[in-house]
Structure formats: C-alpha cells, structure tokens
C-alpha cells in the first residue's frame, strides 16, 4: 500500500530553464515529451517558459521517475526514459539566436548529437553529464570535454569522470 503519492514537475531541461528564467534569462527549452505532456507543457508556459522546441513523441510517454522512500529514508528509483530516448530528433539548427547551450542528461544519442551540433555551429556549451555520465565510455567523454567550453558536475560525478577518462580535472 502506498498511502501518499504526489507528482513533481522536473526534468533536466525544465529545471534548468526555470532556474535560468528566475535569474532573468530567456532560456530556450529543447526537449522531447510524450503523449501525456499536456500538464507539463502547460505548467512550463504558466511559468513563462517557451515550448517552441519541445517535441511531442506521440507513441511514447514523457520520461518519468518513480521514487519510493521507506521510513529509514532509503530510496528505490524506477526510471522510464520514454520520449527522452528520441531526443536526437531535435536539432540545434532548428533554434535561432542561441548564444550558449547546455548539454544535460537526456537520451544518449541526443547528448552526443547536440554536443557535436553546438560545436559545428560555433555555439559554446556547458557539458553537464549528471546522472547520464555512466552511459558514456572513455572516448565519448573525452569528446564531450574537447567540444565543450564549460563543464558542470558535482564532486561524485567529477570523480567518476576522472576514473572513466584517466584524466584529472
């Protein structure tokens, strides 16, 4: 029996864009959502975020995490990537007036593609691998580092990056 349940709106693109918006920025959200997207995209618009480059994948659900926390604060997380796995359908060239990009946790192929597209377009970007870091091998991570102008990660992720690449930060 699960006595309490609540929906939280999250996702890397939405969270980053909302935070930048609160700081006075004009972020452009590029993401993929599923057939169940309406409450999420409505909320983004209500918060002042543009959704012009949020692509709906009609045969998928929006990525979702279900987190169960016991009375001792231990957590089990089940994650379904859903539409996020189609992030490679979005292309940087479809967006205008981009001066800085962020490659944050997303579908594996999409992250690789978007880093390459930012670089080819001459748009500097932040590589923020977050929980997506384990998806990549040494060569892929070295490529991200080479292409990116900036990197953002916590101490745990930085240590994992050093271990996977054999490089120090």
What does each model-found stretch correspond to?
Residues 1-30, 39, 86:
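Glycine-rich phosphate/adenosyl-contacting loop at the front of the ribokinase-like
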Residues 3-5, 29, 50, 65, ...:
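Glycine-rich, flexible loop/turn motifs
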Residues 9, 33, 107:
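Charged, low-complexity surface patches
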Residues 12, 36, 110:
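Conserved alpha-helical elements of sugar-nucleotide-dependent glycosyltransferases
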Residues 23, 60-62:
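Short, basic and Ser/Thr-rich N-terminal targeting/leader segments
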Residues 29-48:
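Short, electropositive alpha-helical surface patch
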Residues 32-33, 63-68:
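Catalytic-core segment of enzymes that process non-peptidic bonds
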Residues 42-56, 60, 68-169:
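Ribokinase/PfkB-type carbohydrate-kinase core domain
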């Amino acid at each position: 029996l699960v006595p309490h349940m609540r929906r939280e709106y999250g996702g890397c693109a939405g969270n980053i864009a909302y935070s930048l918006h609160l700081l006075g920025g004009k972020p452009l959200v590029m993401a993929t959502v599923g057939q169940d997207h309406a409450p999420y995209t409505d909320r983004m618009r209500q918060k002042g975020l543009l959704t012009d480059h949020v692509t709906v994948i009609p045969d998928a659900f929006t990525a979702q995490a279900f987190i169960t926390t016991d009375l001792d604060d231990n957590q089990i997380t089940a994650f379904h990537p859903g539409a996020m796995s189609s992030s490679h359908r979005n292309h940087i060239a479809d967006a205008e007036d981009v001066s800085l990009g962020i490659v944050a946790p997303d579908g594996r192929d999409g992250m690789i593609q978007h880093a390459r597209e930012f670089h080819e377009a001459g748009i500097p970007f932040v590589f923020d691998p977050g929980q997506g870091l384990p998806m990549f091998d040494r060569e892929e991570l070295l490529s991200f580092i080479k292409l990116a102008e900036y990197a953002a990660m916590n101490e745990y992720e930085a240590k994992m990056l050093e271990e996977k690449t054999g490089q120090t930060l």
